[in-house]
Structure formats: structure tokens, C-alpha cells
């Protein structure tokens, strides 16, 4: 997917990027590739692949939601996918990027400073240590972090009631959703939408799962991460 194909795909979904935003995305790409030479950020560094498998993939779910004047937390953001891409493309969205590795946080802050973004913050923390952020967000995202039954317990407590958790998954998404049925019940989550999309170039399937928090969660969740991992809900 060339840059021009990326812009056109966004426009087809009513996302019209300014020249400044286009330049910010390209600078992000350049910083990603340059930093990746000395730090393991991604296995994808070719320009067309970054635009499709990182940038476009990060935006797919956003075409289904109103993001203006909302808050979003991206858990286990890594090199900033999807959260930093969303912050660039939706300047009225307030984004919090959660990442446990300090060196990745340093990279994210470098990009944010370089692009002069004012709607995004980096939180250097494990996702299960975010009690101060409980019930703070309209949306939460996670991409390629863990299986869904584990993610639900970590992420659901961060949502406001009626907030939405979007799990960005590949072709195994529906299998993970079945596996997470008990977790959804215990955490007051319901399936709002399942978005199935194929990437334009290599036809890779993406399954984005939208889970709505219907009411407050029992204060005992999330449990200690070792418990979550050892015995998922």
C-alpha cells in the first residue's frame, strides 16, 4: 500500500488527512525505521508495509466509531500501534499510551516531541498496575498483546460504564472470543460489534472485536497478573 493508496483508503472512510498529518505520519515512519536499527520495535520496516500493516491496520476500527472529544487508552502500545497513529489522525481524541518497557517509552516520547503532538501521553507502567486510571476512558485498545480472556480482565476496569474495548485481532479473533465467554460474563462486557476486514494488498484478515462495558466491574478485578495468566477467567 503506497502512501497515496493509504490516503485514498482513509478518504473512502471519511477520514481526510491534512498535509500536516501526512507529514507527521511520514516522520513517524522515518523515526520508526531509524530507531529500529538499534532497538527491536518491529519486523516491518518497508514503507508500503508500514503504511498498510501498521498505519492502516491501526485505523480500521476507528472508521466505525465517533472519536472526537473522547478518551482512549492503548494498552501494550509497543511502538505506538494503534494509539499513536490514532493520536495523529484524530487530534481531538485524547490518547494515553501504556507501555512497560522504558526504552519503548523513550521512543514514543521522541516521536511525540518531534511531531509536536499535544493530545497524547505516555505511561511507563505494566497494564495491571493502573489503578489510578480505573473507569477513566471512553475507549481502550490492545493489539497483539495477549489472548482475549486475559486482556479483558486487564482492560475492562479502565473503561467508563458504556465504554468500549476494541481488541485488534487476526484470523484467530473469533476463536479467542469463544474462549473469553466466561470472562465477558464476569466482567460485565457484551459484544457490540465484530468487524472483519481484509488488508488491501496481501489480503490478510483482521478481526476487530468491540466489547461494551455494561455496568461497573467488581472491585476484585483485575487480579494480580500472575493469577490472571495462570488461571484466566
What positions do the PLM features span?
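Residue-level signal for inorganic ion chemistry
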Residues: 32, 86, 169, 211
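SAM/dcSAM-binding transferase cores
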Residues: 178-233
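Conserved SAM/SAH cofactor-binding pocket of Class I
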Residues: 59-146, 152
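Short alpha-helix immediately C-terminal to the canonical SAM-binding loop
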Residues: 104-106, 173, 177
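Helix-to-beta-strand junctions that scaffold the AdoMet/dcAdoMet cofactor pocket
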Residues: 90, 159-161
Amino acid at each position: 500500500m503506497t502512501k497515496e493508496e493509504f490516503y485514498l483508503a482513509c478518504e473512502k472512510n471519511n477520514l481526510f488527512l491534512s498535509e500536516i498529518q501526512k507529514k507527521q505520519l511520514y516522520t513517524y515512519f522515518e523515526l520508526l525505521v531509524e530507531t529500529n536499527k538499534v532497538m527491536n520495535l518491529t519486523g516491518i520496516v518497508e514503507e508500503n508495509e508500514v503504511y498498510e500493516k501498521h498505519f492502516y491496520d491501526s485505523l480500521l476500527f476507528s472508521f466505525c466509531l465517533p472519536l472526537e472529544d473522547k478518551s482512549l487508552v492503548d494498552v501494550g502500545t509497543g511502538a505506538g500501534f494503534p494509539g499513536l497513529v490514532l493520536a495523529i489522525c484524530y487530534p481531538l481524541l485524547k490518547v494515553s499510551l501504556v507501555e512497560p518497557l522504558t526504552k519503548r517509552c523513550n521512543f514514543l516520547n521522541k516521536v511525540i516531541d518531534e511531531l509536536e503532538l499535544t493530545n497524547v501521553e505516555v505511561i511507563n507502567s505494566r497494564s495491571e498496575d493502573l489503578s489510578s486510571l480505573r473507569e477513566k476512558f471512553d475507549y481502550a485498545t490492545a493489539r497483539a498483546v495477549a489472548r482475549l480472556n486475559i486482556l479483558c480482565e486487564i482492560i475492562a476496569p479502565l473503561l467508563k460504564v458504556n465504554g468500549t474495548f476494541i481488541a485488534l485481532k487476526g484470523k484467530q479473533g473469533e476463536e479467542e472470543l469463544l474462549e473469553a465467554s466466561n470472562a465477558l460474563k464476569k466482567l460485565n462486557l457484551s459484544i457490540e460489534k465484530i468487524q472483519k476486514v481484509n488488508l488491501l494488498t496481501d489480503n490478510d484478515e483482521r478481526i476487530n472485536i468491540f466489547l461494551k462495558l455494561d455496568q461497573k466491574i467488581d472491585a476484585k478485578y483485575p487480579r494480580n497478573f500472575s493469577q490472571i495468566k495462570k488461571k484466566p477467567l
